[in-house]
Design a protein with these regions (language model features):
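Residue-level preference for the first positions of well-ordered beta-strands
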Residues: 1-4, 92-93, 126-128
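Conserved P-loop
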Residues: 2-89
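A short helix->loop->beta-strand "cap" motif at the edges of active sites that frequently abuts
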Residues: 28, 122-125
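Phosphate-binding/switch loop-helix module in NTP-utilizing enzymes
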Residues: 66-121
Length: 129
């Protein structure tokens, strides 16, 4: 199953967090990665870190503000992407919060996201973007 949360405004991270709680309540193993938020930036991070331990990663540098920040953001996104590929082998559901923002900003490449989609399908995993 692939779930997509997108659009302007609030609620996407809350929806992803809700899906995480639902899945954990059903006994599923979940990993939750954030592409843009840095560690300690948002309130949900404390609980997700407690619940998920190493299966939670806030690997971003904050939201992209200037073009000259793009290379550092790209490097951080690649670290989250590598982590996500590893997690996909171990979990039932992988949540990749802000992945579509990173894609739209050119920090992630379309082929990289398509590769994750293909891997999730092949492994019969739940993927939340």
């Amino acid at each position: 199953m692939i779930l997509v949360y997108t659009g302007d405004g609030k609620g996407k991270t809350s929806a992803c967090t809700g899906q995480t709680v639902r899945a954990m309540g059903q006994g599923m193993k979940v990993a939750f990665g954030q592409f843009m938020k840095r560690d300690g930036q948002a309130g949900e991070q404390t609980m997700l870190a407690q619940w998920l331990g190493p299966r939670f990663l806030a690997g971003g540098l904050g939201f992209l503000r200037r073009d000259e920040e793009r290379p550092a953001h790209r490097e951080a996104a690649l670290r989250v992407l590598d982590w996500a590929r590893e997690q996909l082998l171990e979990v039932d559901m992988l949540v990749l919060d802000e992945s579509l923002y990173a894609l739209g900003a050119g920090i992630l490449l379309r082929g990289e996201v398509e590769d994750l989609l293909a891997r999730a399908r092949q492994q019969d995993k739940h993927l939340v973007l």
